[in-house]
Curated annotation (Swiss-Prot):
Any single Gene Ontology cellular-component annotation: cytoplasm
Keyword terms: ATP-binding, Chaperone, Cytoplasm, Isomerase, Nucleotide-binding
Primary role: Together with its co-chaperonin GroES, plays an essential role in assisting protein folding. The GroEL-GroES system forms a nano-cage that allows encapsulation of the non-native substrate proteins and provides a physical environment optimized to promote and accelerate protein folding.
GO molecular function: ATP binding; ATP-dependent protein folding chaperone; isomerase activity; unfolded protein binding
Protein name (record): Chaperonin GroEL
Phylogenetic classification of the source organism: Bacteria, Pseudomonadati, Pseudomonadota, Alphaproteobacteria, Rickettsiales
One Pfam family, short name: Cpn60_TCP1
GO biological process: protein refolding
Enzyme Commission number(s) from the entry: 5.6.1.7
Reaction it catalyzes: ATP + H2O + a folded polypeptide = ADP + phosphate + an unfolded polypeptide
Principal subcellular localization: cytoplasm
Length: 550
């Protein structure tokens, strides 16, 4: 068993805070319209250049175990903000560092950490309510474009393309991002469908950074029943391996030996495969699988038609340009279905909607209709070099997630202004003791830090700007770091999604509370000698039929 290193009290927290400072210093330079780039060495290929806070945070691992524990806690705040709202990662990092550092000073001075936490929680909840009150719903294309522009670090073209994509497929529609084969940045609407079923095993993931399985030009097998044994499928699996194309299996379920065998062959490289459960239940499941079959020009393998798995060949499989599978959703893009057949299916569903008297059935039929006829908007991101394309694609994905958040919960004044003005409402809060009041004071001071950092990155004095803004009663009055002017942020189009600001604060406070209430830290003791790297097994399974193991 590995021996452990145990640290207690302020010494443990101080070392954790050193790790937090290292990560925060690397991330904070990216904040605001004049934030700087960060260059990250890759294990292979050219270095990555990014202005995305969470990408910077994810790249950092520290050698010292205790400092690394602090850095990883801070990283979790940035990652959570990105997962929930798609943006606000750098703001969450700056806030968490400020809250944790000030909180630790007070704990060292003898304040009760639990009361400090209670005071911080009271303050955060009050600010969240103020953010909700201040938020303004967005409807126009111009407002959507403004959010996309700001979330992509001032790239107006990205904002406009996202607004156009939402106009094409609706605000709730499916929008995906892919790399273009040329210099241009285009929006293309293609046949496609998304349903709420994810991969059956994380071992199907092909992109570990985003935890998604991406299948290019795959075959799609649609099977009505459960798959528990792959023996009847051997002929079709061998044919797919020979074609050197991926395979997506959609069935009622894939379980036991069948799932284990698919995973083993996926890991050995013999078969590029992923499996998902079919969407829906009962008769509705069968109807949705038939929709997918028509969309992809495949056949639903069902015993009703006397079809058996052992008799299936390549011609019975559907195809699509691309399939992306996350933990929760599957998106089929540009299925190769016949246009006339899809139109006929749409008309059939419309007639069923007209005939049904059940509101529930009508709702489910309308969902199917939207999936089949709505299409998928594809944002194709181009550039002069591979590094440029990847960096811009990251920003497009972040901006898209932030724009969806803005549509969901509305927008507030950007540039750190909403948090700054919200801090002024906290002076009226009533608490039980001076320690809780100190917790509120920590939050009041920390809420100034994002704006200070934006101003500092623009080359000005953050403290001076904060003082000037607090002299005004107008909650939308702020500092435009791009033009270096004091403006009405909403009128100037400098807006943030309310969900992004709210999530950044809540995640930051959560991490800071953990740090100031930590009294003991246990980590693995560093080893005196480096352990040899284990040899990677399973290489013999690569390629061709030799990779199959059924």
């Amino acid at each position: 068993m590995t021996t452990k290193l145990i640290k207690h009290g302020s010494k443990a927290r101080e070392q954790m805070l050193e790790g937090i400072d290292i990560l925060a210093d690397a991330v904070k330079v990216t904040l605001g319209p004049k934030g700087r780039n960060v260059l990250i060495e890759q294990s292979f290929g050219a270095p990555k250049i990014t202005k995305d806070g969470v990408t910077v945070a994810k790249s950092i691992e520290l050698k010292d175990k205790i400092r690394n524990a602090g850095a990883q806690l801070l990283k979790s705040a940035a990652t959570k903000a990105a997962e929930v709202a798609g943006d606000g990662t750098t703001t969450a990092t700056v806030l968490a560092r400020a809250l944790a550092r000030e909180g630790n000073k007070l704990v060292a001075a003898g304040y009760n950490p639990m009361d400090l936490k209670r005071g911080m929680d009271l303050a955060v909840n009050a600010v969240v309510e103020e953010i909700k009150r201040s938020s303004k719903k967005i409807n126009s294309q111009e407002e959507i474009a403004q959010v996309g522009t700001i979330s992509s670090n001032g790239d107006k073209e990205i904002g406009e393309k996202i607004a156009k994509a939402m106009e094409e497929v609706g605000k709730e529609g499916v929008i995906t991002v892919e790399e273009a084969k040329n210099f241009s940045f285009d929006v293309e609407v293609v046949k496609g469908m998304m349903f709420d079923r994810g991969y059956l095993s994380p071992y199907f993931v092909t992109n570990s950074e985003k935890m998604v399985a991406e299948l290019e030009n795959p075959f799609i097998l649609l099977f009505e029943k459960k798959l528990s044994n792959l023996q009847p499928m051997l002929p079709i699996l061998e044919a797919v391996v020979q074609s050197q194309r991926p395979l997506l299996i959609i069935a009622e379920d894939v379980e036991g030996e069948a799932l284990a065998t698919l995973v083993v062959n996926r890991l050995r490289g013999g078969l590029k495969v992923a499996a998902v459960k079919a969407p829906g239940f009962g008769d509705r499941r069968k109807a949705m699988m038939e929709d997918i079959a028509i969309l992809t020009k495949g056949e639903l393998i069902t015993e009703d038609l006397g079809m058996k798995l052992e008799n299936v060949n390549i011609k019975n499989l559907g195809t699509a340009k691309r399939v992306t599978i996350s933990k929760e959703n599957t998106v089929i893009v540009d299925g190769n279905g016949d246009k006339k057949n899809i139109e006929d299916r749409v008309l059939q569903i419309k007639s069923q909607i007209a005939e049904t008297t059940s509101d529930y059935d009508k709702e489910k039929l309308q969902e199917r209709l939207a999936k089949l006829s709505g299409g998928v908007a594809v944002l194709k991101v181009g550039g002069a070099t591979e590094v440029e394309v990847k960096e811009r694609k990251d920003r497009v994905e972040d901006a898209l997630a932030a724009t969806r958040a803005a549509v969901e919960e509305g927008v507030v004044a950007g540039g750190g202004v909403t948090l700054l003005h919200a801090s002024q409402t906290l002076t009226k809060l009533k608490v039980e003791n001076k320690d809780q009041q100190a917790g509120i004071e920590i939050v009041i001071e920390a809420l100034k830090d994002p704006l200070k950092q934006i101003v500092k990155n623009a080359g000005e004095n953050g403290g001076v700007v904060v003082g000037k803004l607090l002299e005004h009663n107008d909650k939308n009055y702020g500092f435009n770091a791009q033009d270096m002017q004091y403006v009405d942020m909403i009128k100037a189009g400098i807006i943030d999604p309310a969900k992004v600001v709210r999530t950044a604060l809540q995640d930051a406070a959560s991490v800071a509370s953990l740090i100031i209430t930590t009294e003991t830290l246990i980590v693995d003791e560093p080893s005196d000698k480096e352990e040899p790297m284990p040899m990677r097994g399973g290489m013999g399974g690569m390629g061709g039929m030799g990779g199959m193991d059924f």
